[in-house]
């Protein structure tokens, strides 16, 4: 668990899309999309964090990074956006416009992640990236308060200084994108029923455009590797397995695509086309020994115990007596102190190293 070493708040996941992208209806999970876009924005901005993903998740084609579609709507309490606007917001109405732009649906009453409602000077929104909804209380164009609340009762749980609302759509249908899609679809749609339906959904603002339209909206699609900042480090664990996993996933996708007239290639990269970026890279592979003598060896073992504390401490004693160094990462202060006291009582030598320079 990477979060145990660097803190859960610094670990983000870029999950695989679980919905069927070959369908002409839009069935994406707002939580899943927001999670993916939060990870992409962190990579694009060069944030200090670790993004964990799989080969299957990296196969999906994305909108060009320059479109900044992963950018969150950032709001601060006690800020008058009329006199102190941002690039996205200069008042109450802009917040509504920006939510719609990011894929949020005005449902009149909250219907879970990806929905919002606006009444009077109050906007209730359920961000896809948060496990709770927030209430934005405006007075004119001043955002007086941001409150976390219970949607069932409206009861306030706590006030927040700021909130980031991540998009719940991976592409945006702009007038320019519409024109580009019309041009690419017009002729083939004359003889293809599915493409005709895509063209209809493009023109109908009352329905969500399916992901199958995304390749037609942009001149060129990109992938996760194109979102990486120059300072990013890409870590590949067992590259051969990553490629095998991608091939297996593409075979399953090909079965889903059968009879839809939407090609796998239009929505996904090939296994050989996986893009890990042009930045610094670290690769971890298993080494098989075949009659080779090693100059030196560092043996790493797992404690390999579960449940009973006595088993844990007994195993620790045997490892220490055998000359091993055992590393514990205990972020929680009270748990760390309890562990120290137990080890001292059992006569097991310890050394504490804190994540503060010069402290030990």
Please name every model-derived segment.
Residues 1-360:
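Conserved beta-alpha structural segments and adjacent helices that either
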